[in-house]
């Protein structure tokens, strides 16, 4: 058994070279809930969270093995984009890599600010290795050029994975809702099922003819990005690739129309609450709106990213997670 494991274990394929006294600095994000946590940690202690301790240990191993010190230059939202633009225009050498979001990544790449990671001079980056997100590398390349990637280096891409949370108490209150985990395991968790259960939960407690986030109960609370995820989750893609790795428009119009029609039902105002509307009219933050609506039992389901699972732990709500 051990021999087989050794034969199949992936190798790093990086030469045993020392780069003593070299500093590798990442331009990172200082953006409230989306601050970069995975590049640099000041120290390791029992008071630190698991991610910080793992980051510190990884950076120390890199220092010991290769002589490279990992640092970061953290910039706020309004300065992050400009920092890279200025560095390209007038290089200072203050940083060599950047952690950013996909919107900035596309802008940086189209403006020629980033290295092509598939170029011959970029060695030892094999995106078929399991620690890289191979699907992203394959999907984001154009003409065999790739300008950004993600993988085990970051946790923020996992935090940004969209899920559906459900209130376990409310599920028990509605006898017509079955074991939701069993639906998933049996391949029966569909948009039609979600729509059916959303409608069961609606309670206009204050009788004003609309669903309020702080008094009523809705079937689904969601933010503005969730409808896009319904399209992606429905298998909708705009492009495929040809043999030269060039994008080809290939939208399945009929399927897209079918999914859009289901989306109109899922997000109908008579059984949902759009948290963006709550923020725009209620004078509260998105964090407060989410915790109040879902965390205090005013929504059966809530659609958002995995990071909101962590945020919701401040609330007294017993909830589960569905795809």
Regions found by a protein language model. Name each.
Residues 195-198, 229-231, 236-283:
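Glycine-centered hinge/linker elements that transmit conformational signals in sensory
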């Amino acid at each position: 058994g051990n021999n087989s494991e050794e034969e199949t274990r992936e190798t790093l394929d990086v030469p045993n070279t020392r780069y003593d006294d070299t500093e590798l600095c990442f331009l990172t994000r200082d953006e409230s809930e989306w601050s970069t946590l995975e590049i640099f940690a000041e120290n390791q202690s029992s008071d630190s969270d698991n991610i910080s301790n793992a980051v510190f240990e990884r950076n120390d191993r890199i220092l010991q093995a290769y002589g490279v010190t990992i640092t970061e230059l953290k910039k706020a939202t309004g300065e992050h984009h400009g920092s890279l633009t200025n560095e390209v225009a007038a290089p200072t050498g203050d940083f060599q890599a950047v952690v950013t979001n996909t919107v900035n990544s596309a802008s940086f790449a189209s403006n020629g600010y980033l290295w092509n990671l598939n170029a011959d001079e970029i060695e030892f980056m094999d995106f078929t290795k399991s620690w890289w997100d191979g699907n992203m590398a394959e999907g984001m390349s154009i003409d065999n050029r790739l300008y950004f990637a993600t993988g085990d280096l970051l946790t923020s891409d996992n935090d940004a994975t969209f899920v559906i949370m459900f209130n376990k108490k409310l599920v028990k209150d509605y006898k017509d809702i079955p074991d939701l985990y069993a639906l998933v395991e049996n391949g029966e968790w569909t948009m039609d099922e979600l729509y059916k259960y959303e409608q069961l939960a609606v309670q206009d407690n204050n009788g004003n003819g609309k669903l309020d986030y702080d008094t009523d109960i809705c079937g689904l609370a969601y933010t503005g990005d969730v409808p896009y995820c319904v399209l992606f989750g429905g298998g909708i893609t705009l492009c495929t690739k040809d043999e030269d790795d060039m994008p080809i428009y290939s939208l399945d119009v009929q399927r897209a129309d079918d999914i859009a029609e289901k989306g109109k039902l899922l997000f109908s105002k008579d059984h949902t609450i759009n948290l963006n509307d709550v923020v725009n009219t209620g004078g509260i933050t998105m964090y407060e709106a989410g915790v109040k609506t879902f965390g205090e039992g005013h929504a059966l389901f809530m659609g958002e990213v995995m990071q909101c699972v962590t945020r919701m732990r401040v609330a007294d709500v017993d909830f589960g997670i569905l795809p």
